[in-house]
Design a protein with these regions (language model features):
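Short, flexible helix-loop junctions that flank or precede catalytic/ligand sites
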Residues: 1-206, 210, 220, 225-226
Length: 226
């Protein structure tokens, strides 16, 4: 018998404790759109997302729905009504839960991981219908994230998917944990690409292909040091 254990604190750490930049707080104020937190396994994606959802939970009177595998952080009812669903315990799969999600009239939806085409399609559809949607991917840059999403789809659908992303994508946060110089622990290095008040993310996502994506993403607002 073998097992892997991960310590999850009961108390969700805030933005100040985690050292998250103000631009991430501004993303939490969005009424709708798709927000992606990316990075390798064990890079703190769940902790960042928990802080973002807790900020919304503390400030907005809305309905929050999460679909996770497994549930890591427990969100109490503050100003939001929070429903958390665990894959295999409360639902058979991410795709099944997301198909039923819109019937529950959520305002904010968390998708623990966009693993397959059906889950990615559901995330885009939920964001398109006016919900603030958070999700994770195991990618290391904004350009790689967009390519990963687009490449999941058949070739004849990829231009349509780029157009969908151009309309709903609000931000991509790429993060990793790096060792401190003094060896006392690790620090989160993060680079955030956000949609500015103009159409930066929209224009870049709509027209770029795999060859030009890295250059194009430099035209949007970038924050951080990753």
């Amino acid at each position: 018998v073998a097992a892997v254990y991960r310590t999850i604190p009961y108390e969700i750490r805030g933005f100040k404790d985690l050292g998250l930049p103000p631009v991430i707080a501004s993303i939490c104020d969005k009424p709708r759109g798709l927000v992606l937190v990316t990075g390798p396994t064990g890079s703190g994606k769940s902790t960042t997302l928990a802080a973002m959802l807790d900020k919304i939970n503390s400030e907005r009177h809305e309905h929050m729905l999460t679909v996770e595998d497994p549930i890591e952080y427990l969100h109490q009812h503050k100003k939001c009504v929070v429903n958390q669903r665990e894959v295999h315990a409360d639902t058979h799969s991410f795709s099944n839960a997301l198909r039923a999600a819109l019937r529950e009239d959520p305002d904010v939806v968390l998708i623990g991981e966009m693993r397959d085409l059906e889950t990615i399609e559901s995330a885009l559809r939920i964001a398109e219908t006016g919900h603030l949607t958070f999700a994770t991917l195991h990618t290391n840059s904004a350009a790689q994230t967009i390519n990963r999403i687009v490449d999941v789809f058949p070739a004849h659908q990829q231009s349509q998917v780029r157009a969908q992303l151009s309309l709903v994508l609000e931000g991509i946060m790429c993060q990793s944990l790096l060792p401190k110089a003094d060896g006392s622990g690790r620090v989160c290095a993060k680079r955030t690409v956000v949609r500015p008040s103009s159409s930066g993310v929209s224009d870049s996502t709509r027209v770029l292909d795999r060859a030009t994506m890295p250059r194009g993403t430099r035209s949007v607002s970038c924050h951080g040091v990753l």
